[in-house]
Design a protein with these regions (language model features):
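N-terminal beta1-alpha1-beta2 submodule of the flavodoxin-like/Rossmannoid cofactor-binding fold
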Residues: 1-108
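Short, glycine-/small-residue-rich phosphate/pyrophosphate-handling segment
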Residues: 109-123
Length: 123
């Protein structure tokens, strides 16, 4: 069986409604690149009130949407979302909820990670 080697990279996955979390994501990318780390910046599409995707699978502009393969192949993960009433934004939760089989198969095991957020409220 042939093993496919992938380039090591830090996956910076974020959702941003107003741009604050996007700015943090790019600041993290700048810092990682200064340390000679390869970086992939990805986002997730918006969802409707019924928590279903409301945007095309390929964005017309801006960051590329994250795929499960991006998560599988990353060497580390930085995850960012605005905080809304003490929780992450619905589009990020919707995406993460779709990755249950990655968790069940330990696809992210031994990969360092961090989270970042921005909020305008106390919680």
């Amino acid at each position: 069986m042939e093993t496919i080697m992938h380039e090591k990279y830090l996956l910076i996955l974020f959702y941003s409604g107003t741009g604050a979390v996007k700015n943090l994501a790019h600041a993290i990318a700048d810092g990682a690149e200064k340390e000679s780390l390869a970086v992939k910046i990805r986002t997730v599409p918006k969802v409707s009130a019924n928590t279903e995707a409301t945007e095309p699978s390929i964005p017309e502009s801006g960051e590329v949407y994250c795929t499960k393969q991006d998560l599988i192949n990353c060497s580390g993960l930085a995850l960012g979302s605005p905080t809304r009433f003490g929780s992450m934004a619905a589009p990020m939760k919707y995406f993460l909820d779709s990755t249950g089989e990655l968790w069940a198969n330990n696809e992210l095991e031994d990969k360092p990670g961090c989270v970042f957020t921005s909020t305008g409220s106390m919680h």
